[in-house]
Regions:
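Class I (Rossmann-like) S-adenosyl-L-methionine-dependent methyltransferase catalytic domain
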Residues: 1-39, 46-92, 109-116, 120, ...
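Short alpha-helical functional segments enriched in proximate histidine and acidic residues
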Residues: 124
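Short catalytic micro-motifs in class I SAM-dependent methyltransferases
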Residues: 104-105
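A conserved beta-strand element that flanks and buttresses the S-adenosyl-L-methionine
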Residues: 101
């Protein structure tokens, strides 16, 4: 993961300005088809908190990020928010959830790190719990603004998830251009 990037105030400001209209409304609506209101949801990589706010309208949400700077900034807006500092690779918490959600937060993890994260997410989910994650669609890695972006396709994600999860939906969608993204919705076996 890109630890230093998200602790730099200038880069965090740039990130927030770069993504002003990119929120997870589509993803949250998909989750809403399968998850009852008031369920316990963990958001990974909440960043400036756009999706956290939307998720909070339906669910009991715990926001998380590895960036202390993002967490600090959100706490200034909402001191009562339930926030955790978590590394998406290891997810060191003893809390459990009905669903785990991320919108492009796991894009910096290598395939091995993503597999490790999925295994840990399985442990943190209650029975029949769900994951919903959006990632960049494609193959390989690319660099962007001092960050490494890892791309995934249907086959990669199916292989990583098939032993511990039943895949409910695996769909391409548009984030910045047609079919540049993929989301996976899966249920704990």
């Amino acid at each position: 993961m890109e630890e230093n990037f998200y602790e730099n105030e200038e880069k965090v400001d740039g990130y927030a300005e770069f993504t002003p209209t990119h929120d997870g409304t589509l993803l949250i609506d998909v989750l809403g088809e399968y998850l009852p209101e008031a369920a316990a949801v963990l958001e990974l990589g909440m960043g400036p908190g756009k999706d956290f706010k939307k998720l909070s309208q339906r669910y009991r949400v715990t926001g998380s990020d590895f960036s202390q700077l993002f967490l600090q900034r959100y706490r200034e807006q909402d001191p009562a928010a339930d926030l955790l500092r978590l590394d998406a690779r290891t997810l060191e918490t003893d809390r459990t959830f009905d669903a785990i959600f991320s919108n492009k937060a796991l894009i910096h993890l290598s395939s091995d790190e993503l597999q490790q994260s999925f295994e840990r997410q399985h442990e943190l989910l209650n029975d029949n719990g769900l994951i919903l994650h959006s990632l960049w669609f494609g193959e390989g890695e690319r660099s962007f603004n001092d960050l490494t972006l890892v791309y995934h396709n249907e086959q990669d994600l199916t292989k990583m998830l098939e032993t511990s999860f039943d895949i409910v939906a695996l769909e391409k969608h548009a984030k910045m251009s047609d079919d540049d993204s993929i989301y996976v919705l899966a249920r704990k076996k």
